[in-house]
């Protein structure tokens, strides 16, 4: 999990991390961990970490393509096998591990765990934030917009583009990830072509035109 800004700034000297996952694709039966099944105490959390029974109380959720998970700072989480996600997050590398599933680092040794810090920051309540196929859908001509997440750290939406769309954000940069299809981006006298799997950074105040048929993950701060 990741700490919030207050804890991370005081202990690590950098910001914490809130993030969002969008499931781009997944295998049948794939699951991820999102918080706990039910509320638990800090004491039980610590005991289960140390006796290696933490997975018994983790909230393992079957996922589907297009699902959305808002991972607020302090939420226990882990991506399971067979899942491809696009992640929107705060710019921070602070992560506290309580289990690494027996994996080894590049040096062949177990990676460091951060149990004491995790006990300080982990939310031991069952998550109450909706997840899955969520988000208000707005149709605007040839564009369908699905609002995924709006918080004080970032906002994210899914764009289904069928023809053209102008983008210009005065207050923030814009990040675009092409999930499906192909897009031509026109700006001033030039243009570039991007396709599935590509991402592009658009500076604040720059007006661009998107042309094509595509599914796009749009995020800004």
Model-derived features: where do they sit?
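Active-site region of the double-stranded beta-helix
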Residues: 1-65, 80-182, 186-188, 192-199, ...
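Short, charged beta-turn/beta-strand-edge "cap" motif at the junction between a beta-strand
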Residues: 75-78, 206-209
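Conserved residues at beta->alpha junctions
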Residues: 36, 73, 204
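Short small/polar-residue motifs
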Residues: 142-143, 203-207
